């Protein structure tokens, strides 16, 4: 092997990165033999952006979607699990309302921490180093919840709350990571559908939790039927319920264990990895630009099959005259300041401190905040809706748990599940912004109807409005608030900005549960009114938040069928580095020429 070939092999090995599996292909290594980092970046990203939808993308959806499956499974399971564990750990099967709220809010508190923390870390340390750690946190916390108990030295509720906060941190970390990784590995044409399908795993998680709960209730039916109430739940009944809630919550970590290998072996995102490589090579004094429209898919195939191939191009003269075929890329002097600045807190504040950029972050964060406030509003009506369809949860312990599981399954399949998948099939056709705006508009109208006409609505009327709200919540802002932040920000801040947006959403959910949720009984006892007497006014407040979400969504740009680099260039004024080529890289047909020479067309 000649010295030149030895050098080429060494350079190729130096450019290769670790990782890669059946779900996330290592695109960087496909072009490791390309010496120019800018050209290597261009070819790798072009292959990702122009790829046809295939089983590779389906596997990526499954691996990235596991976190959201676990998230929704856990939230649904804890609602059913609390109903089970109340008979075991609290007298008469009555859990204090403050304790119940604490258990349910604790996950959201942890989620906020995870969203902010992991979002920043993924931009600082890289996607590969972080992805999988949040799933390990989720799995570990899930297992710990299943084995805790009560003793004179340990408060059961406090310990369970602690592990739910820990689990929330893992769940929160999955939001920015799964979003941006899916976004950066997806083909441009179907990126919205792929990201929406990842998020739609939430619906499958809810359905799975309902099915597991129903199977457990039927499996322990003989132990539960004899108990007509919490006071008559004997030792065998309590033992059955204690086993049931532990199995129900513990089953949530099974999908995560299966997907953990794929997350830990993921390659670094080509966009992040190659951008960091460019930052390290910023000592290059000038760059040369490729003629737009050249070096297409055929070039990728030729370069992969023959590392030493030189791509012939037909150049267009600046004045329209054809200059014929050329064996070298066309190069034009370009100032180095086109390279995006290095990520830092100072640059982050400077960039988003400008309204034309900051309004996008404000838009994604505040729309998510408004949405999550109102999502809790739908949950306030669940008991009324279940009663309307005959699943009020009255009667024996068995009947209560059975009705709760079946009733919630009906509501999920009636509204949430179709809504998610309508978004998957239409988001790359209709666009993100129209779906988000229309969803907020419909939710505003529906909440107004429920709020201002609440006492004139029958149970069936509420059921219809509830299903419409569930449908347009998911065929609307619930999906798009997750999707848009994963696309609309530049690579160096994509994870951080997504984490901030998602964190603001969960803060909205916490406020709704702790503050607005208590308003439903405002003045009820004092004025001798029935329970939930102020629910109609609370729904009116939620309608206002939906209107604010609609108005704020106008600040967010459309990203349909645009590459991530085109989005950054259009909305953040950042020139795509892939358009340039370092002048220090010698052309294969003129290797003896000085590396600092730049030819201008």
Features from the language model and the residues they span:
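Transmembrane-helix signature of 12-pass secondary carriers
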Residues: 2-601
């Amino acid at each position: 092997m000649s010295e030149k070939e030895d050098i080429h092999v060494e350079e190729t090995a130096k450019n290769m990165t670790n990782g890669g599996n059946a779900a996330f292909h290592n695109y960087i290594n496909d072009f490791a033999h390309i010496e120019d980092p800018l050209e290597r970046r261009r070819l790798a990203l072009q292959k990702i952006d122009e790829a046809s939808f295939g089983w590779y993308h389906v596997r990526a959806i499954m691996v990235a979607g596991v976190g959201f499956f676990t998230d929704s499974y856990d939230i649904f399971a804890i609602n059913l699990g609390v109903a089970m564990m109340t008979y075991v750990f609290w007298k008469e099967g009555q859990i204090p309302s403050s304790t119940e709220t604490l258990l349910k809010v604790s996950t959201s508190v942890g989620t906020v921490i995870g969203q902010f923390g992991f979002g920043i870390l993924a931009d600082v340390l890289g996607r590969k180093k972080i992805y999988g750690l949040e799933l390990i946190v989720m799995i570990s916390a899930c297992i710990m919840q299943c084995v805790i108990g009560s003793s004179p030295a340990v408060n059961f509720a406090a310990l369970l709350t602690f592990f739910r906060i820990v689990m929330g941190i893992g769940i929160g970390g999955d939001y920015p990571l799964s979003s941006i990784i899916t976004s950066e590995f997806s083909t441009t044409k179907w990126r919205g559908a792929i990201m929406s399908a990842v998020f739609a795993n939430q619906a499958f998680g809810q359905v799975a939790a309902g099915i597991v709960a129903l199977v457990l209730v039927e499996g322990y039916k003989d132990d539960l039927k004899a108990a007509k109430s919490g006071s008559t739940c004997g030792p065998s009944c309590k033992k059955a319920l204690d086993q049931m809630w532990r199995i129900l919550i513990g089953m949530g970590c099974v999908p995560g264990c299966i997907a953990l290998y794929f997350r830990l072996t993921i390659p670094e995102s080509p966009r992040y990895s190659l951008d960091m490589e460019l930052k390290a090579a910023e000592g290059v004094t000038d760059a040369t630009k490729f003629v737009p429209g050249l070096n297409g898919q055929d070039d990728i195939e030729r370069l992969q099959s023959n590392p030493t191939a030189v791509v012939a191009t037909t150049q267009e003269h600046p004045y329209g005259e054809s200059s014929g075929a050329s064996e070298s890329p066309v190069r034009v002097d370009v100032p180095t300041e086109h390279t995006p600045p290095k990520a830092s807190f100072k640059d982050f504040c400077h960039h988003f401190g400008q309204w034309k950029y900051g309004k996008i972050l404000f838009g994604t964060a505040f729309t998510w905040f408004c949405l999550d406030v109102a999502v809790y509003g739908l949950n306030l009506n669940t008991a009324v809706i279940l009663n309307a369809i005959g699943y009020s949860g009255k009667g024996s312990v068995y009947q209560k748990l059975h009705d709760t599981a079946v009733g919630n399954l009906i509501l999920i399949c009636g509204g949430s599940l179709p809504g998610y998948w309508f978004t998957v099939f239409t988001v790359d056709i209709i666009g993100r912004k129209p779906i988000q705006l229309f969803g907020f508009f419909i939710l505003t109208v529906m909440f107004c109807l429920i709020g201002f006409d609440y006492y004139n609505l029958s149970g069936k009327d509420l059921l219809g409005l509830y299903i419409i709200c569930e449908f347009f919540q998911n065929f609307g802002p619930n999906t798009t608030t997750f999707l848009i932040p994963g696309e609309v920000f530049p690579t160096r801040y994509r994870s951080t900005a997504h984490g901030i947006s998602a964190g603001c959403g969960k803060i909205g959910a916490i406020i709704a549960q702790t503050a607005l949720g208590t308003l439903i009984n405002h003045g009820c006892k004092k004025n001798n009114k029935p329970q939930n007497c102020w629910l109609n006014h609370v729904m009116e407040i939620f309608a206002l938040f939906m209107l604010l979400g609609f108005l704020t969504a106008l600040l967010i740009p459309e990203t349909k069928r645009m590459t991530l680099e085109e989005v950054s260039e259009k909305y953040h004024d950042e020139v795509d580095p892939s358009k340039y080529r370092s002048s220090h890289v010698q052309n294969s047909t003129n290797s003896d020429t000085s590396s600092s020479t730049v030819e201008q067309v």
